[in-house]
Amino acid sequence: MQRKIPRRIVDGVLLLDKPSGMTSNGALQTARRLLNAAKAGHTGTLDPMASGLLPLTFGEATKFSQILLDADKTYEAGVKLGTTTDTGDADGNVVAEHPVSVTREALEEVLSRFRGEIDQLPPMYSALKRDGKPLYEYARAGIEIEREVRRVTIHDLELIAFSGEHFSMRVRCSKGTYIRTLAMDIGAALGCGAYLDALRRTAIGDFDAARAVTLEALEASPAAMRDGLLEPVDALVAHFPKVELQPAEAAAILQGRELRKPEDGQGSVRLFCGGRFLGVGEWQSGSLRPKRLIATQTGQ
């Protein structure tokens, strides 16, 4: 019988370029196996049909996954006009077809209506859960579940290309935005219907897909060098100001005590001691308090 290799402690963030046709969980499990990591998670589901940036967190980095879940996302999307599907994307069954007579000017005018704060109805084919079960399971069983409209923000919406019955767009949006729903709503506003036929996530917060690695590149790397493809844990909080602590201060913070500091900061900060990342602290009423700390023996 082949002995099972024990999982090891791995801490960091893998900026993965997920291929189209793979689930986010499938990508996570493949990367986890290649790194032989004990603990792993991802920072928000990317649809199977979509490709692009999927940050995977390992070990202590999983404590900060929520930061990327809450971050703005940027996508490049392809939209087919004149056809609607039951899923809102190319994987679904066609439910209606309409003639298309759309000019670039008309499309630009409709796109302008979707910039800023908008309301969206989450699609039935989504990972949102009701009574512990994702909506897509109800949808596959032919059951329609009542959903609440969500207010989301489209920060930027740019038309990249247009060719009569198809266009591509670049979207930077708030968390919780469904690009499939955006494509369908644009099609409805144009009077011809539409579905999403391509989607690539190009950025999350300050992370860009240009820095991402593929599963093929990860697998091709020697096992001993794969950890070198990971970003350090503190990369997830690089936008917070840095505070360097003295050893005695660090000891107090690690024991859960607050510090009175001469400087009066605001909000969340990255905590370091001797160049080692300790976690995230927060200024409150002139005191620096621990907010989320990492296991110090594995801090990067």
Curated annotation (Swiss-Prot):
Q: Which SUPFAM superfamilies match?
A: Pseudouridine synthase (SSF55120), PUA domain-like (SSF88697)
What is this protein's record name? tRNA pseudouridine synthase B
Pfam families listed in its UniProt record: TruB-C_2, TruB_C_2, TruB_N
**Where is the catalytic site?**
D47
- Alphabetized NCBIfam families for the sequence: TruB
Its job: Responsible for synthesis of pseudouridine from uracil-55 in the psi GC loop of transfer RNAs.
Q: Which residues pair up as cystines?
A: none
- Keyword Isomerase assigned to the entry: answer is yes
Taxonomy, superkingdom: Bacteria
Upper lineage:
Bacteria, Pseudomonadati, Pseudomonadota, Betaproteobacteria, Rhodocyclales
Q: EC number(s) on record?
A: 5.4.99.25
Enzyme class, top EC level, equals isomerase
Cite a single GO MF annotation: tRNA pseudouridine(55) synthase activity
The cross-references to CDD domains, in alphabetical order and at most eight, read: PseudoU_synth_EcTruB, PUA_TruB_bacterial
- Please give the family membership noted in the entry: Belongs to the pseudouridine synthase TruB family. Type 1 subfamily.
Which reaction is this enzyme known to catalyze?
A: uridine(55) in tRNA = pseudouridine(55) in tRNA
Keyword annotations for this protein, in alphabetical order, are: Isomerase, tRNA processing
Which GO BP terms, alphabetically? mRNA pseudouridine synthesis; tRNA pseudouridine synthesis
